[in-house]
């Protein structure tokens, strides 16, 4: 068993896939963005279910402050990914945006105005793991273009939100973080390990090379692998349900 299998996913490049998304209408063609976050199949089975109910994946992602786009309106092109699971290119399952103040009514609307983080989600059906592409974008006055270090910043902002730990500075391969977040009566304990040698650090086949600093790289080449455990939090309190209904 190699290190990737031990971490709970299959390396797409071993079976004809890629750790870069496929983005339409790029110049030159066929450029993509790094799949820089993986939710391991070693996670709690309920977290691997694509549902908001019963502690599922989308409840976890909202616990990390990521939700549906403002009023359900889609902004930006959809992307595809080939995860080497025999399905060739599959379209992203969803795109979720950062919820300012963790408010699930207006939080993503503020992200659309002021910029911030967003994630695209795919499932690798051969392993059951989820692959995410995360990047940080500028505000609406800059047409939401990606800024310097957008891929690494987006990845680390997501990890920070999922663990309640501030992730900053230069990261190393095998560096780990462990932390907890809660949502709708479920507590999630996330163990994060950064691994190398999955995505290219240079500009080869990377879209949005404007994120690359002069003399630097498009990305540090690290992927954050998350193993998420879930358990019932305090019994659902009436006050919690009211707060949730108010988007708090």
Question: Model-derived features: where do they sit?
Answer:
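Mature extracellular/extracytoplasmic regions of secreted and cell-surface glycoproteins
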Residues: 1-219
């Amino acid at each position: 068993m190699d290190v990737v299998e031990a971490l709970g996913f299959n390396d797409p490049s071993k079976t004809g896939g890629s750790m870069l998304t496929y983005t339409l209408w790029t110049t030159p063609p066929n450029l993509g963005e790094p799949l820089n976050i993986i939710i391991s199949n070693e996670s709690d089975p309920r977290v691997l279910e694509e549902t908001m109910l019963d502690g599922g994946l989308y409840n976890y992602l909202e616990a990390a402050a990521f939700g549906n786009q403002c009023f359900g309106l889609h902004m930006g092109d959809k992307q595809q990914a080939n995860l080497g699971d025999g399905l060739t290119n599959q379209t992203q399952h969803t795109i979720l945006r950062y919820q300012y103040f963790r408010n699930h009514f207006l939080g993503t609307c503020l992200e659309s105005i002021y910029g911030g983080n967003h994630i695209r989600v795919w499932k690798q059906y051969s392993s059951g793991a989820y692959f995410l592409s995360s990047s940080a974008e500028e505000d609406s006055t800059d047409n939401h273009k990606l800024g310097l270090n957008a891929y690494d910043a987006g990845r680390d902002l997501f990890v920070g939100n999922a663990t309640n730990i501030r992730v900053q500075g230069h990261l190393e391969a095998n560096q780990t973080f462990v932390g907890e977040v809660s949502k709708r009566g479920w507590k999630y304990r996330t163990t994060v390990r950064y691994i190398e040698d999955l995505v290219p650090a240079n500009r080869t086949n990377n879209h949005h090379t404007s994120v690359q600093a002069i003399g630097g790289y498009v990305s540090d080449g690290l992927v954050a692998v998350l193993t998420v455990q879930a358990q019932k939090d305090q019994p659902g309190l009436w006050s919690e349900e009211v707060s949730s209904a108010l988007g708090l």
